[in-house]
Amino acid sequence: MEYLNDKDQHLIDKLSKKINDNNQYLGFLNTNTKELTHRYHIYPAMMIPQLAKEFIELTQQVKPEIKKLYDPFMGSGTSLVEGLAHGLEVYGTDINPLSQMMSKAKTTPIEPSKLSRAISDLEYSIREMTILYHEGNYKISNLPDFDRIDFWFKEEVIISLQLIKNCINEFIEDDLKTFFMAAFSETVRHVSNTRNNEFKLYRMAPEKLEIWNPNVTEEFLKRVYRNELGNMDFYRQLENVGNYSPKTIINKQSNIKLPEEFKDEMFDIVVTSPPYGDSKTTVAYGQFSRLSAQWLDLKIDDETKINQLDNVMLGGKTDKNIIVNDVLEYLNSPTSKSVFNLISHKDEKRALEVLQFYVDLDKSIKETTRVMKPESYQFWVVANRTVKMISIPTDIIISELFKKYNVHHLYSFYRKIPNKRMPSKNSPTNKIGNHSVTMTSEIILMLKNYINKS
């Protein structure tokens, strides 16, 4: 490829050799994906930390001067944690307030002995207040009353959760409070009446619900002590790399229009995994986040309710005044045009929804390009999905969208998503047509910003 220089080729060759030596290398099977603070909280479609670690370390080998990492879709904060663990300043964006809280908790190291004392104080407070409550000497006057709370939580669970929340709120320091709220958030999901291991909101079957009687306090403390170990490892790792004053900036607004502090040509590397484009169906970020966000009093903004989260994510709201031909011409992506035409023959409404996702993604790509330094690398982990039996090669579409902003696709690496059946090895990722293949593999796009000489 005409764009490759020696550094590009070295990076590609280095990772390619690892893959050639072990074709399951990027699968990271039997690898601990819960190191450091990555264990804090589950999240839909999480990028495993070993991927972010791989891309950062490879880039540092050819560009040891890099200082600032950006993740425009930070999700659970995986790339940010790995960036800090490798001595970088990190910046992330996500419109989901639960993502913001989780990422703040995971990127905030707390001195271990200080945290240990706080945990002891909190546990004592919770157990004491629980005894007082059952003796009738403590009344909880601020029980939540959000919509359908009695459908999703049993009465005794609501009482226990609010008691724990009240004890957490006694802490003055935000860092400690955020640490505890991360454990509280995951506890909320576990002790609710939702099915276990589901990201969407489905209520338990009646026969299971009848015997469902979680010990809320013990579930919460189990997560607190688990996360304490993660904080200790993270704190020591930052000491090991000399990152004594780690810098994390979390943008709570859309990555389509970044705030002023995100300057032109500011960042050295992007490591990210964008949404698949089906947040209302397959990967329901909004449904996953809703109960935790309601308990934590998290907001998207003053006008938008938390149950509308999926509507404000990329592609969540279709522009009714869209002029399709003009949009397709502007996107300048032959693949997205072909996909739109194929889907529209079957379902025009779905075709417009798919197109809207790529319109929004293009705006994000444009803004991401603005804040990236010339010659900087970007690593995008994507998965191709199927709509109306049409396979959508998102990897190719993203490459085409980037090209008009002078960001070029250098190489693609492939990894099997563990625990899923792999489609035929020879299935081409760039073939558009009648296919119905579940997302069993991911494509890692290696891209590079080029200096615009025009």
From Swiss-Prot:
It is an enzyme of class 2 (transferase). The keyword Transferase applies. Disulfide bonds: none annotated. Keywords: Methyltransferase, Restriction system, S-adenosyl-L-methionine, Transferase. This is Type II methyltransferase M.MvaI. One of its GO terms (biological process) is DNA restriction-modification system. The keyword tRNA processing does not apply. It catalyses: a 2'-deoxycytidine in DNA + S-adenosyl-L-methionine = an N(4)-methyl-2'-deoxycytidine in DNA + S-adenosyl-L-homocysteine + H(+). Its EC number is 2.1.1.113. GO terms for molecular function: DNA binding; site-specific DNA-methyltransferase (cytosine-N4-specific) activity. Signal peptide: none annotated. InterPro entries: MeTrfase_CN4_CS, SAM-dependent_MTases_sf. Belongs to the N(4)/N(6)-methyltransferase family. N(4) subfamily.
